[in-house]
Amino acid sequence: MLKHSVNLSLYGLLLVVLGGCWGGNYLLLPTEPLGGGLNSLAREESPQLSYDGRYLVFVSDRPGYRAIFLFDVAQRQLLPLPGLNRPGMVQDQPSISGDGRYIAFRSEARGKSDIVVYDRLTRQQEIITATWQGEVQFPAISGDGRFVTFQSDRSGQWNIEIYDRGVRSPLPVAPNRQTFN
């Protein structure tokens, strides 16, 4: 009996997902051994596209540690993210704003998990959970980069948090006491 299997790389997944959206106009993005392009021989994961499809943010092990990369789909090249990635730091779960200016991600640079927003224009990082107790994960940034939502266990269970970067404060989210059957 013959066994058939299908292995999809990030490029393969991107091709399948976006192929239908672009009416069959596929991007042909080769794998590069040293990682100068979108795909490398290292593990690539957690892809997120900007609203207009111009930018793709993802995580890769290509430098020998988990790092965040930004790919310009129109130019078909990686873009630099100065000051974002450093050896020995775990950074993952990226989310990108609609215009590609802001990247929210989870970092363990301070010995605990934090949600950080990187501004590509100013090259600055804002740790929005610096004073929070507990773990945080799975950030998602709004299209304009003002709001960041993520999971937090600071109340003793995993809950959804919403942070407003405009006023630099979490939005109060009252627990819902309803149960659903």
PLM-predicted stretches and their roles:
Residues 1-21:
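Sec-dependent bacterial lipoprotein signal peptides
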Residues 2, 21-181:
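Sequence signature of WD/YWTD-type beta-propeller architectures
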